[in-house]
Amino acid sequence: MDARQMKIKAAEAALEHVENGMRLGIGTGSTAEEFVRVLAEKVASGFQISGVPTSERTARLCLELGVPLKSLDELPELDLTIDGADEVDGKLRLIKGGGGALLREKIVASASARMIVIADETKVVDVLGAFKLPIEVNPFGQLATRLAIEKVASRLGLTGDIVVRASGDGPFMTDGGHLILDASFGRIPDADALAVELNAIPGVVEHGLFIEMASMAIIAGPEGARTLKAS
């Protein structure tokens, strides 16, 4: 079973948790896109949901495949969000934002009664941090913001490069018009403390640490999908 097949298995298992008539947050990224595809097949058979996308990219795919969408302003309270993750640990703490949609992903997840994470087994880690931590920042004063992040990281014993994410000949811009700094910390032993510190930096719009947000994770491997709950 290759990586894409594992993502499809996770998406199919997550679909079993979606009930007819649900208000559904729909994530961003390669695994979330496989979920959109299996969801679209069910919608085509008469299944009804109202989806709220976490990015313009997800919205385009949903519209292309016939998944009905609403804005979060139209549906400010959601029953469930299904989204991927770049890393997930045993406490269901996540690193997200590899696809650049972390702000909207976190807003939508926070508006949901439950969040189910779907991922392949390569995303499960003992300690977060091998994947670069995305930090969304306002373009204004981004160098000052980066220095503030470096000072916070140093206080917590974290080291590594923090660089502006690029796209083509310029910086990557989020749907909200912000920059993303990718922090290569390697290991983040105290993700909770780092999340609190990053939240206190004025130029930080959002960060990719999702703490106490996921209610369960569906992890796919060669033998099929399994459920992971917080330890």
From Swiss-Prot:
Q: Which Gene3D superfamilies has this protein been placed in?
A: 3.30.70.260, 3.40.50.1360
> Which keywords belong to this entry?
Isomerase
Any idea of its EC number? 5.3.1.6
Enumerate the residues binding substrate. T28, G29, S30, T31, D83, G84, A85, D86, K96, G97, G98, G99, K123
Q: Per UniProt, what is one GO molecular function of this protein?
A: ribose-5-phosphate isomerase activity
**Can you tell which superkingdom this protein's organism belongs to?**
Bacteria
Q: Which pathway does the record list?
A: Carbohydrate degradation; pentose phosphate pathway; D-ribose 5-phosphate from D-ribulose 5-phosphate (non-oxidative stage): step 1/1
- Which reactions fall under this protein's catalytic activity? aldehydo-D-ribose 5-phosphate = D-ribulose 5-phosphate
Q: Where is the active site?
A: E105
Classification via InterPro entries: NagB/RpiA_transferase-like (IPR037171), Ribose-5P_isomerase (IPR050262), Ribose5P_isomerase_typA_subgr (IPR020672), Ribose5P_isomerase_type_A (IPR004788)
Q: Which residues form a coiled coil?
A: none
Enzyme class of the recorded protein, top EC level: isomerase
Which cysteines are disulphide-bonded?
none
Q: Which PANTHER family match?
A: RIBOSE-5-PHOSPHATE ISOMERASE 3, CHLOROPLASTIC-RELATED
Q: Note the subunit structure.
A: Homodimer.
Function of this protein? Catalyzes the reversible conversion of ribose-5-phosphate to ribulose 5-phosphate.
User: What's this protein's family per the entry?
Assistant: Belongs to the ribose 5-phosphate isomerase family.
Q: What is this protein called?
A: Ribose-5-phosphate isomerase A
User: Per the UniProt entry, what species is this protein from, by scientific name?
Assistant: Sinorhizobium medicae (strain WSM419) (Ensifer medicae)
